[in-house]
Amino acid sequence: MSVLLVGVSHRSAPVSVLEKVAITDADRPKLIDKMLASSHISEAMIVSTCNRVEVYAVVDAFHGGLAEVGELLTRHSGLAMPDLTKHAYVRYSEAAAEHLFAVASGLDSMVVGEQQVLSQIRGAYATADAQQAVGRTLHELAQHALRVGKRVHSETGIDRAGASVVSVALDRAAQVLGDLAGRTAVVVGAGAMGGLSVAHLARAGIGRIIVVNRTIERARRLAETAASYGVESSALELDRLHEAMSAADVVLSCTGAVGAVVTLADTHRALADRDRAEFPAGDRPLVFCDLGLPRDVEPAVAGLPGVAVIDIESLQRDPAAGAAADDTAAARSIVAEELAKYLAGQRMAEVTPTVAALRQRAAEVVEAELLRLDSRLPGLAEPERDEVARTVRRVVDKLLHAPTVRVKQLASTPGGDSYAEALRELFELKPGAAQAVAAPMEITAIGPDRTAGLADDFTPGHRLDFEQHLGEEGKPA
């Protein structure tokens, strides 16, 4: 069994494609159930954020698993297979682990070094685990990835470029508005991103925060959090969004809803109210930070006078969205080190059952020979028989000690699983003595680039996409 990753992210696809592939919290359990019901998938986890959707699946065959995940994503997104393959990337086995470690470290984020992705991976794991979709393989992979992310953030300065997408969005808003201190902000959505927005706004010295949400109770709770930071705050239901916007300087939205939340009609109403107020719209810009995926702000809003829209796609071009080169290099070094540890542990886990099976086989042979001795020498005294038994067992243990210790050492090296395979072949151990591994033919389909450098993860030389493996109908090529 090996881990297959199929993903679409801000690096590989435009926002229009990401919006279609986006998986909501409500959809995620349904898609996991469908994967578990398929023929080749035994474990599954979906990481879905504002700028990425990644499916991690433990599969018994590369091509079969890829076909099933690809079909699932095309049905969910409504995209034709050729359209999906243009923007999807595939990682397998070691490369899948390397990618998740990089994601957890913030190396693959739109804002390099942001930490929110750690909680998103933790949430993805919790959702999959609650559905009993996580076994040993994904458990160890996800937990190790979380440890890698924590280590990178504690030992490097990779997050100095900005704690999250929110911080960069607010920097862009400040370029339009000037200092944010004392201004009024509207936060649309009371989820994790809403909470992050409130924290960043408070640190920026915002004067007032209005939280808008479909559920007023959640809006009030987040408003109370804002108040605990010493910021004047209030809460409104979503149908009163235009009222909040009429008083705002900046609106941050990330609801995860399907369809526009900030509509052209509501924005027109808000701007009309501002025109009747003390400050005309032309003298008081209204800035929208649309952090939602799918987008929360209707595209036509960006064309209104006095309005600026900062969205996920524009943030990709922000020069402030990168960490210092030395911090990034240090983070990559940690990822490489931890990947080597993880892979060594996985190889060891694969060889341990084989060693145990070998010792069990030897013990069975010893017992069989002792029984044969009893039948041949029925008059053998008990003390002599015990001494013979101890001697035979010592001989067997000494013969097995060196090869079993050595095979465990070799198992931690690249290609070490071949030694365990040799033991299984030489001693005719049962196939179930160790986990099955992917056939060599399937592994070589990945090519020599399975451990490609993280910096060029999506360049043509390093990217592996569906088209190498699937036909137009999503069947194995």
UniProtKB/Swiss-Prot annotation:
Metabolic or biological pathway: Porphyrin-containing compound metabolism; protoporphyrin-IX biosynthesis; 5-aminolevulinate from L-glutamyl-tRNA(Glu): step 1/2
This protein's UniProt keywords: NADP, Oxidoreductase, Porphyrin biosynthesis
Binding site residues for substrate: T49, C50, N51, R52, S109, E114, Q115, Q116, Q120
GO terms assigned for molecular function: glutamyl-tRNA reductase activity; NADP binding
Transmembrane segments: none
InterPro entries: 4pyrrol_synth_GluRdtase (IPR000343), 4pyrrol_synth_GluRdtase_dimer (IPR015896), 4pyrrol_synth_GluRdtase_N (IPR015895), GluRdtase_CS (IPR018214), GluRdtase_dimer_dom_sf (IPR036453), GluRdtase_N_sf (IPR036343), NAD(P)-bd_dom_sf (IPR036291), Shikm_DH/Glu-tRNA_Rdtase (IPR006151)
Catalytic activity: (S)-4-amino-5-oxopentanoate + tRNA(Glu) + NADP(+) = L-glutamyl-tRNA(Glu) + NADPH + H(+)
Entry annotated with the keyword Oxidoreductase: yes
Site features described as Important for activity, chain residue numbers: H99
Residue sites binding NADP(+) per the record: G189, A190, G191, A192, M193, G194
Domain of life: Bacteria
GO-annotated biological processes: protoporphyrinogen IX biosynthetic process from glutamate
Keyword Membrane included in the entry's annotation: no
EC annotation from Swiss-Prot or TrEMBL: 1.2.1.70
CDD domains the record matches: NAD_bind_Glutamyl_tRNA_reduct
Active-site residues, as the UniProt record annotates them: C50 (nucleophile)
Other known facts: During catalysis, the active site Cys acts as a nucleophile attacking the alpha-carbonyl group of tRNA-bound glutamate with the formation of a thioester intermediate between enzyme and glutamate, and the concomitant release of tRNA(Glu). The thioester intermediate is finally reduced by direct hydride transfer from NADPH, to form the product GSA.
Function: Catalyzes the NADPH-dependent reduction of glutamyl-tRNA(Glu) to glutamate 1-semialdehyde (GSA).
Domain notes: Possesses an unusual extended V-shaped dimeric structure with each monomer consisting of three distinct domains arranged along a curved 'spinal' alpha-helix. The N-terminal catalytic domain specifically recognizes the glutamate moiety of the substrate. The second domain is the NADPH-binding domain, and the third C-terminal domain is responsible for dimerization.
Family membership noted in the UniProt record: Belongs to the glutamyl-tRNA reductase family.
Quaternary state and interactors: Homodimer.
Protein name in UniProt: Glutamyl-tRNA reductase
